[in-house]
């Protein structure tokens, strides 16, 4: 069966929402898909954090890292930190989310994630499973 990108994205978003709810976070989903974020996470203090959810299974031949296209829209423009707070990047084979503050992407349209290596010092590893970005009064870098 051919991969349906929209279906796959919906699956990643559902996984994110389920995990967020398990952690006591509320998730608001806008009607339609015209906004630059997929959902808003509301923490226990009522702070709203705008989240774009992306997922990847892709790993380049010979590479240990998974490549994720972090851009959005038809042009895959870089996420705008004035419009989106956090990129929730799901690496399917490792079943793990990275919660990366969009400002930390520094305009990158694609990123590499290395969840299979526990001792990795790759740029975004500090954000692996970092659900804490949604807690304690809201989004903190």
Where are these regions (language model features)?
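Mixed-charge (Asp/Glu-Lys/Arg
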Residues: 1-35, 40-141
């Amino acid at each position: 069966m051919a991969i349906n990108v929209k279906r796959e994205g919906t699956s990643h978003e559902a996984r994110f929402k389920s995990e967020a709810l398990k952690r006591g976070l509320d998730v608001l989903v806008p009607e339609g898909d015209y906004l630059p974020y997929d959902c808003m996470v509301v923490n226990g203090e009522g702070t709203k954090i705008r989240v774009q959810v992306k997922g990847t299974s892709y790993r380049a031949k010979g590479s240990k890292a998974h490549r994720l296209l972090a851009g959005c829209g038809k042009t895959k423009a870089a996420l705008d930190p004035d419009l989106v707070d956090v990129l929730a990047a799901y690496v399917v084979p490792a079943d793990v989310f990275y919660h990366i503050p969009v400002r930390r992407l520094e305009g990158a349209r694609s990123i590499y994630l290395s969840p299979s290596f526990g001792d990795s010092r790759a740029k975004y590893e500090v954000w692996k499973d970092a659900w804490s970005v949604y807690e304690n009064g809201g989004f903190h870098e």
